[in-house]
UniProtKB/Swiss-Prot annotation:
Function: Negatively regulates transcription of bacterial ribonucleotide reductase nrd genes and operons by binding to NrdR-boxes.
Protein name (Swiss-Prot/TrEMBL): Transcriptional repressor NrdR
Name of the gene encoding the protein in the UniProt record: nrdR
GO molecular function: ATP binding; DNA binding; zinc ion binding
Domain (ATP-cone): residue spans on this chain: 49-139
unnamed zinc-finger residues: 3-34
Pfam families: ATP-cone, Zn_ribbon_NrdR
HAMAP family found in the cross-reference section: NrdR
Cofactor(s) annotated in UniProt: Zn(2+)
Keywords, ordered alphabetically: ATP-binding, DNA-binding, Metal-binding, Nucleotide-binding, Repressor, Transcription, Transcription regulation, Zinc, Zinc-finger
Length: 154
């Protein structure tokens, strides 16, 4: 590794630790020429995750979209924003740990809904009303009945 201070290629590793929840390795290095220390990170070559939308179009996965959807669903609910970010990161981690590079927007929506259902029923219903695009009041009531009856098939 080339020293960022003097450009010398002879450096030695003085400390190695796991970083970023085990997805990276942090190394402290020391230049053998100028004795200055610096940090490097080693990460897997991150393959982009592709979302296949309902209309068949594709776009890059964006964790921020999950987070903003959670924020809207949980607006004026007693839920910390840090918890919502944690959920978005958990979903991202789960998706990246899969072998597939593509995921459908439907799968992501179901992952969000299952977590919201455990977190806050009002937020779950809010999210479901937008995500499931209920055609009428009766289909909305059916979803509420499922929720009240313990959640079969939802």
């Amino acid at each position: 590794m080339r020293c960022p201070f003097c450009g010398n290629e002879n450096t030695r590793v003085i400390d190695t630790r796991a970083a970023e929840d085990g997805f990276a390795i942090k190394r402290r290095r020391e230049c053998e020429n100028c004795s200055k220390r610096f940090t490097t990170y080693e990460r897997l070559d991150d393959r982009p995750l592709i979302v296949v939308k309902k209309d068949g179009s594709k776009q890059l996965f964006d964790k921020h979209k999950i987070y903003t959807g959670l924020l809207k669903a949980c607006e004026k609910r007693p839920i910390a924003e840090s918890k919502l970010l944690e959920i978005a990161e958990e979903i991202e981690r789960e998706l990246k740990n899969r072998l597939e590079q593509e995921v459908t927007s439907l799968e992501i929506g179901e992952m969000v809904m299952s977590r919201l259902k455990k977190l806050d029923e009002v937020a779950y219903v809010r999210f479901a009303s937008v995500y499931r695009q209920f055609k009428d009041v009766n289909s909305f009531l059916e979803e509420l009945k499922k929720l009240l009856n313990g959640g079969e098939n939802s």
